[in-house]
Each structure stands twice: as structure tokens, then as C-alpha cells.
């Protein structure tokens, strides 16, 4: 079986892929995974670090041949506002709920969520159901330089028992990333468990 240990960004000149692999957005964050290509073949992706791939990126096989990554169609909502200011306000509400969103000049695209649709319609948005590739904006945790987006999240949360804020969002991490996703959570609750009793 052919292996892939390197990649090229979309738009690389003189690139002629011999095969393609279609992946939804939540399966394009990869390090090591067996990929099933559109032509029925398989290839083993084995990268040094996790990478968040975009539509059109190219995987380089050990024999030098290229495989193009395509963003698969997904069930989405297209959100439109009355004007640009209204659209920015809608984007703020979505960001406040930590939702993955594809931000464009005249619309916002998100995964279908009927609770969110009701909220957006209440804010005056037009919400349409669409099926197309989804390329959400990369969050602050992803490196902005190049494609090496390792998840080095060092969560130093100082968790008091009373948070004082309401997180009205759910994190349904049904993501098959294909790599070891290690989060180091160091919770400082002010407890010293080294109890020395005289």
C-alpha cells in the first residue's frame, strides 16, 4: 500500500493529481489515517504532525504521485442579513456560541442546527438549507503560518466552582480525527492534596 508523508498547498503550479479523496470538514484534520480514494484505492496517510487540510490541498505519495483533497458536500444553512452591518451582528451571535462558520462577503454558512436557525430567524436573518462543501474559518487555536496546525492546546483553566457565565452551547465532538488528540487539562481549584497531619 502506498504511503503519504508530505503534502502541498492548493494551487501548487504544475500539479496533476492522479486521484482524489472527498472528506467533510471534520475529517480533514488529519495526521495518521487510512484514506479511501474516489477510485476505490486506499492510501495510508502518515504525517509527523496533525494538519488541517483545505479543499484542493495535495497529498504526496511516496512514489511522487499526487492525491487531491476535495471538500465533500455537507448539509448546511446559508445565512443572509438585511445588509452588511446586520450580517456582522449575526456573525457575532454565532461566534458567541463557538459555532464553526464559513464567513463570506454576503453570507455566512454553518452546519444545520434547528435551534440556531430559530434564533437567527428571530434576529431577522434569512436562513436557507443548502448542500455544498464547507470550509469554516480557522479558529484562534490554529497556527496562522502555513498548514501545520497541531493542536497544542495547553488549557490552564482556573476553575472556580462558580463560573459566573452561561455557556449556552454544546460541544458535540463526534469527530473522527484519525490522530491522537491530546488535551492537557491542568485544573487549579486551589486544592493541595498533599495532606500532612501532625
From Swiss-Prot:
Region (Disordered): 137-198
Cellular compartments annotated: Cytoplasm
Deleted gene: phenotype: Cells are dependent on nickel supplements for growth, suggesting that this subunit is not absolutely required for urease activity.
GO cellular component, one term: cytoplasm
A GO MF term: nickel cation binding
Residue ranges, compositional bias (Basic and acidic residues): 149-198
SUPFAM superfamilies, A to Z: Urease metallochaperone UreE, C-terminal domain, Urease metallochaperone UreE, N-terminal domain
Any Gene Ontology biological process: protein folding
Keywords: Chaperone, Cytoplasm, Nickel, Nickel insertion
Family: Belongs to the UreE family.
Functional description taken from the UniProt entry: Involved in urease metallocenter assembly. Binds nickel. Probably functions as a nickel donor during metallocenter assembly.
HAMAP family documented for this protein: UreE
Official protein name in the record: Urease accessory protein UreE
Originating species: Rhizobium leguminosarum bv. viciae
Underlying gene: ureE
Amino acid at each position: 500500500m502506498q504511503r503519504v508523508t508530505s503534502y502541498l498547498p492548493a494551487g501548487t503550479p504544475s500539479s496533476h493529481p492522479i486521484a482524489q479523496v472527498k472528506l467533510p470538514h471534520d475529517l480533514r484534520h488529519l495526521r495518521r489515517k487510512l484514506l479511501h480514494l474516489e477510485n476505490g484505492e486506499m492510501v495510508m496517510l502518515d504525517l509527523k504532525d496533525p494538519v488541517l487540510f483545505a479543499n484542493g490541498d495535495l497529498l504526496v505519495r511516496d512514489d511522487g504521485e499526487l492525491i487531491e483533497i476535495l471538500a465533500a458536500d455537507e448539509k448546511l444553512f446559508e445565512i443572509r442579513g438585511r445588509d452588511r452591518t446586520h450580517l456582522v451582528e449575526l456573525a457575532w451571535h454565532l461566534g458567541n456560541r463557538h459555532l464553526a462558520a464559513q464567513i463570506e462577503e454576503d453570507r455566512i454558512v454553518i452546519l444545520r442546527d434547528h435551534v440556531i436557525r430559530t434564533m437567527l430567524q428571530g434576529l431577522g436573518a434569512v436562513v436557507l438549507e443548502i448542500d455544498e462543501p464547507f470550509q469554516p474559518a480557522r479558529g484562534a487555536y490554529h497556527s496562522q503560518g502555513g498548514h501545520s496546525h497541531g493542536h497544542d492546546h495547553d488549557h490552564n483553566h482556573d476553575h472556580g466552582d462558580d463560573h459566573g457565565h452561561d455557556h449556552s452551547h454544546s460541544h458535540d465532538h463526534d469527530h473522527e480525527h484519525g490522530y491522537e488528540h491530546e488535551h492537557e487539562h491542568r485544573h487549579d481549584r486551589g486544592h493541595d492534596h498533599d495532606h500532612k497531619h501532625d
